[in-house]
Amino acid sequence: MAKDIKFSEDARRSMLNGVSKLADTVKVTLGPRGRNVVLEKSYGSPLITNDGVTIAKEIELENRFENMGAQLVSEVASKTNDIAGDGTTTATVLAQSIVSEGLKNVTSGANPLGIRRGIEQATQKAVEELQNISTPVESKEAIVQVGEVSSGSKQVGQYIADAMDKVGNDGVITIEDSQGIDTELDVVEGMQFDRGYLSQYMVTDNEKMEADLDSPYILITDKKISNIQDILPLLEQVVQESKPLLIIADDIDGEALPTLVLNKIRGTFNVVATKAPGFGDRRKAMLEDIAVLTGATVITEDLGLELKDATMDSLGKANKVTVDKDNTTIVEGAGDSTAIEDRVQLIKNQVAETTSDFDREKLQERLAKLAGGVAVIKVGAATETEQKELKLRIEDALNAARAGVEEGMVSGGGTALVNVINKVAELDADDDAITGVNIVLRALEEPVRQISENAGFEGSVIIEKLKSEKLGIGFNAATGQWVNMVDAGIVDPTKVVRSALQNAASISALLLSTEAVIADRPDESGNDAGAGAQGMDPSMMGGGMM
């Protein structure tokens, strides 16, 4: 396919137009008085949202050169969302400012590589100062504050804080749709994995269709159980103890499953069997997690163990186990606390070392199951549109709260970025780099300026007054008052602010040093080839409908 090429000023100007179109759309949502944006959906009702990354991902411009600029800023938002889970609009505003101011200087003859060097130096200094003024997020009240600022709702902040209080900072917190109009928090204590009972005849509660086991023994193996004789000696010992038994195995088939069910129905013993969670190597790791949690030994060939070798010492214990058709929940496993802590640390090390997003996600799930319970926030609303919008806000609040716990918090509303300006201005940079430093100094003001203007105030006036205030004093755009931001509960996670600045600076510096841009040339009709294919007559497709 033929290509169009643009060079130097023409190339950068086209990309700036795209950057501005996306950023101007996103930045209207910033702050407590930010507006919403309505997104058309191909099916269902439109989505009304003020979530920056959701808006950015929807934008695709007709002009290919402008679209490249827009997609670069969209990447800033996405990267910030991936790292910190929030701060996407702030990152977009910072990127627009750096690109816009940078292009003015490049057009005036400044050295793009010198500007890039200055941007990197100023960003590094700003990040250092943000970390210096950061305070830890340790109390439940602080988590409420972080969640409230992110979502714009104190109630949402309370849900997040309650959930983290129940399951721990590393615990699993999921966000689901509620069938009612009220939002509620449901906490599942202990470890849960997505495998249910192998036979409905194993249930003990016919109304809930659940099997409840009190103080059960737990047999864990990665083997398939086909012959009941393999575990018969062990079953006889469990019967003598008059305790229920949970069997977690690769599978149970042949004569083994009917025999277990028959003895359960006759009342010989109370047993529930379930398949092992996960697949392949991940299954082995998850079985070992369960074993550590319950104090069991995994019956596996890796350890040279056979099912017939299993003894009562091989079994784990728990205070309670609940099994339904889809899930198994183990509450208060009897594993050694030191062994559990060592296992948690091992998984944390694996999370830090892995380069695969998928592996990292699965490792974090395992970590959460070991480190805490499972909390479910069920989001209710009067309409589907409202429910979608609320879910996005709760997701942002949850991510912000976790980021706050991880790296602490700073004054919110863009105040912290203005607070570090004086330290960044002290940088000793050469003539080319000082231009880049000044570009970052200007960008650090932009979030406060945009928040103020969205609330109907003059941004430049607010910034000048803010620069003369003591550390921690800032402008509450919701009320129009000057307050101690932390005392007023207006805080941002340090990780969110840091990630927004670093990602914005990184992409913007690269864009400023761009000298040529290459894009596919549209076809003769003025449409993209891809767009033209969408209107193809169904009769031209190779075959009719079946």
Swiss-Prot record:
Its EC number is 5.6.1.7. It comes from the Bacteria. GO terms for biological process: protein refolding. Pfam families: Cpn60_TCP1. One of its GO terms (cellular component) is cytoplasm. ATP binds at residues 29-32, 86-90, 413, 476-478, 492. Its main location: cytoplasm. GO terms for molecular function: ATP binding; ATP-dependent protein folding chaperone; isomerase activity; unfolded protein binding. Residues 521-546 are annotated as: Disordered. It catalyses: ATP + H2O + a folded polypeptide = ADP + phosphate + an unfolded polypeptide. It is found in: Cytoplasm. Keywords: ATP-binding, Chaperone, Cytoplasm, Isomerase, Nucleotide-binding. Forms a cylinder of 14 subunits composed of two heptameric rings stacked back-to-back. Interacts with the co-chaperonin GroES. PANTHER family: 60 KDA HEAT SHOCK PROTEIN, MITOCHONDRIAL. Belongs to the chaperonin (HSP60) family. Together with its co-chaperonin GroES, plays an essential role in assisting protein folding. The GroEL-GroES system forms a nano-cage that allows encapsulation of the non-native substrate proteins and provides a physical environment optimized to promote and accelerate protein folding. This is Chaperonin GroEL. It comes from Tetragenococcus halophilus (Pediococcus halophilus). The lineage of its organism: Bacteria, Bacillati, Bacillota, Bacilli, Lactobacillales.
